[in-house]
Amino acid sequence: MFLGVGSTYNLKEELLSVYLSPFTFKSTYVLDEKLSNEGAFGVDPGSNARHELGILIRTKWDKELVTNMAMTNELELYSDYINNFGNIDVDWILTFKFKINNFLEANFRTHLIYDDDIKIRETNDQGEVETLGARVQLKQQLGIGILYSF
């Protein structure tokens, strides 16, 4: 969860917006007791919350690439002033929308996340933790929808 004071710049003809918040409060809450005891999502082990103060830059760009094909690019960058300033958390969503015909459309989305505070465990075949560190997380989605107008 983010709470901050900032300013937004919009370029309507390019469908581009840039939000800059030099004072942003970021909170991470882990309500699952097992996960909070493990220190998941960057919270201290046994704690349910983590709070940070930093800078947030958020951009969104919508673009029609060709007829019936559009792109949306959303990028969010955050850096904590107090802990490891300069380590940038990245949240990037890239979506392509395809209108196939009057009844069918498809979406392809990639979602990339990197947060230095989130440590991912890699285990060997015996279940022993071999490495613990920040990793790039990537999710891809393909959606196909049927359109119907009343």
Report residues per predicted region.
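Outer-membrane pore/translocation modules
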Residues: 1-54, 128-137
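Repeated loop/turn-to-beta-strand initiation elements of outer-membrane beta-barrel proteins
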Residues: 14-18, 68-71, 103-108
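Outer-membrane beta-barrel translocator domains and adjoining extracellular loop/strand segments
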Residues: 30-37, 84-89, 119-126
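Surface-exposed extracellular loop regions of Gram-negative outer-membrane beta-barrel proteins
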Residues: 62-81
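Outer-membrane beta-barrel "beta-signal"
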Residues: 136-150
